[in-house]
Amino acid sequence: MKNVLILGAGGQIARHVINQLADKQTIKQTLFARQPAKIHKPYPTNKMQTTSGKKVIQDR
């Protein structure tokens, strides 16, 4: 299984990439966005997790 990190997951280009990879069961997506609420639904059917910029900064 390949892991793919999508930076800026709330943007328009990322939306297209997320949809392109959604049907591929051999890919696990990690979506990174400053505002996770802007990540477009429906979420992909393959394995996926989301994280936000604030969380990463606070975890340091």
Swiss-Prot record:
Signal peptide per UniProt: none
Gene3D superfamilies membership: NAD(P)-binding Rossmann-like Domain
Family matches, as InterPro entries: NAD(P)-bd_dom_sf
Region (Disordered): 40-60
Source domain of life: Bacteria
Miscellaneous information on this protein: Missing about 170 C-terminal residues compared to orthologs.
Name of the protein described by the UniProt record: Protein YmjC
Classification of source organism: Bacteria, Pseudomonadati, Pseudomonadota, Gammaproteobacteria, Enterobacterales
Gene name for this UniProt entry: ymjC
